[in-house]
């Protein structure tokens, strides 16, 4: 296959232009899968570094990879290490992603690589990295979006910008629980990003299986999701968000609202908000939110793999 050529929309490629070769390292397993046009699913490292305390973060990352493999796809966990964007981290490399790792959106990848720092990719950062080799499927917990209180401050996740630019399918349990869900869905519509419910008619509210805004379409199988994504991309579309509800619902909406208000009162802003909210939720729910969070992340990775496998068979 010629260098840098995508054989059909979303199939992926085994190589990348020589100009970026010194910045990217692709694991042999991932490279082989892309070369053979087998399904590959991207996984982020922010969940490993900042979503859970050590060693739970690594355990969740490995469980997500196992779920991808069980569904018949190849996992590609992404992060920045030793001056390179690594697509397909090893287990020992995952162990280097702790709370001191930089949190990388699309804008941060280059500086982190050049400066030789350890960088954990967000959804947006993972999508940007995955795009360099043509990976179009990703599983995660929740998408970033519009923070509560917008426009004071005007805080909107770079995940949405990446979704607006990059043709990819992301499986999540809706958007992050601390966000303004309604405003985020409105912005997704403005950006032309389909919000697809997996066997549900409303967007999951991360910890809760239902109760969010209506989705733009519903699918009832991985094959149907793959066909919707294929048609969307053939028509020139960008990302597709597939909302998979958690298997177990928690009613923590009031608790989240109180913790978000506390973060605001304490002057916690930007990338520091999510870790603060997650830690407080864990403490005040007696560990229930962290358990549900772990389970939905792994399940979403598995569904992303099922959709990737179905897409490869189209």
What positions do the PLM features span?
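Divalent-metal (Mg2+/Mn2+/Ca2+)-assisted nucleotide/phosphate chemistry catalytic cores
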Residues: 90-167
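Glycine-rich nucleotide/cofactor/substrate-binding loop typically near the N-terminus or early
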Residues: 45, 50-52, 57-112, 234-248, ...
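A C-terminal functional module that forms or caps the active site or interfaces directly
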Residues: 232, 236-299
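N- or domain-start disorder-to-order transition segments that initiate the globular core
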Residues: 19-37
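Solvent-exposed alpha-helices and their adjacent loops that cap or buttress functional pockets
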Residues: 31-36, 40-41, 70, 129-132, ...
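General beta-strand structural signal in soluble alpha/beta enzymes
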Residues: 41-43, 76-80, 119, 137-142, ...
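Active-site glycine-rich loop that binds ribose-phosphate moieties when present
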Residues: 122, 151-164, 168-189, 220-227
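Anionic-ligand binding region
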Residues: 207-233
């Amino acid at each position: 296959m010629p260098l840098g050529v995508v054989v059909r929309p979303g199939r992926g490629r085994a190589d990348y232009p020589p100009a970026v070769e010194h910045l990217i390292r692709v694991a042999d397993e991932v490279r082989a899968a892309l070369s053979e046009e087998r399904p590959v699913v991207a996984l982020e490292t922010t969940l490993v570094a900042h979503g859970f305390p050590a060693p739970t973060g690594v355990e969740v990352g490995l469980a997500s990879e196992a779920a991808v493999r069980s569904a018949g796809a190849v996992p590609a966990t992404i992060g920045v290490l030793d001056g390179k964007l690594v697509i397909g981290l090893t287990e020992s490399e995952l162990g280097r992603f702790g709370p001191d790792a930089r949190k990388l959106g699309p804008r941060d990848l280059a500086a982190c690589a050049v400066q030789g720092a350890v960088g954990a990719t967000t959804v947006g950062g993972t999508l940007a990295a995955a795009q360099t080799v043509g990976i179009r499927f990703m599983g995660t917990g929740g998408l970033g979006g519009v923070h509560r209180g917008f426009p004071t401050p005007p805080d909107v996740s770079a995940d949405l910008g990446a979704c607006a630019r990059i043709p990819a399918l992301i499986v999540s349990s809706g958007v992050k629980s601390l966000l303004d869900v309604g405003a985020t869905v409105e912005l997704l519509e403005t950006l032309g990003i389909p919000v697809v419910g997996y066997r549900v008619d409303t967007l999951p509210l991360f910890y809760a299986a239902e109760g969010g805004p209506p989705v733009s379409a519903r699918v009832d199988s991985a094959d149907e999701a793959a066909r919707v994504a294929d048609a969307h991309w053939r028509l020139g579309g960008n990302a597709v968000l597939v909302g998979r509800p958690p298997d177990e619902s928690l009613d923590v909406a009031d608790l989240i609202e109180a913790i978000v208000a506390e973060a605001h009162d304490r002057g916690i802003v930007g990338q520091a908000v999510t870790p603060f909210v997650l830690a407080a939720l864990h403490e005040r729910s007696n560990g229930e939110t962290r358990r549900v969070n772990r389970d939905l992340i792994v399940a979403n990775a598995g569904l992303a793999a099922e959709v990737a496998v179905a897409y490869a068979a189209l």
